[in-house]
Amino acid sequence: MTLLGSAAVAMWWDISPATKAEFENWHSHEHFPERMRIPGFRRGSRWADLAGGEGFFVLYELDSYDILASPAYLARLNDPTPWSTQMMPHHRNMVRSQCRISESFGGGIGQYMLTLRVSPVPGKEEALHREIRSRLAALPEIPGLTGAHLLKTETPKLVETTEQRIRGGDAVADWIVLLSGYDADVLDQIGREALAAALVAAGAREAPQAATYRLSYSLAATDLAA
């Protein structure tokens, strides 16, 4: 998949089996449409843990970085709906990263997504970025893969929002590598093995934290009726 715009919000969290059905209903029919009606939001996608675990990965693609601090977005973050207020406490082990899209290669939306959370060794940022860019550029041409991207977290300097207070505080990832494709085995082989080892050799602080997901739902702003 080609990422839309130049900024993104990348999130990971766990949902218990007892809450999953209501969560997916709320997230698909209220929360995603609400977010996609915010000016500058281009597309949202929700990905479920491939192994059937409790984890979800959610990605919002935005026109530009300044959308993260826009009055329209902050208004929603500080005035959640009653259903959102009910569901937010069920987001366990929340990681929420507000990012600039640094590199994006490929096209289309694959069925699977592998996420790698990476932190550079201080002083190795440029070397690590060069290695990531070089490797990601070639990956979408490999059978089984369709997209490869690098996001870098840059958190806006804002006061804590109402949604964050409801969840009890969010952790933050650093750099995020996303690989998408239609063959989960190829995705894992390249992402968890070859790419992960290359990143450590190029200046990643430790082995990237990897997880693989299957597409659950996607909604673009253009999908909504005017």
Each predicted region: which residue ranges?
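Macromolecular interaction modules
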Residues: 1-226
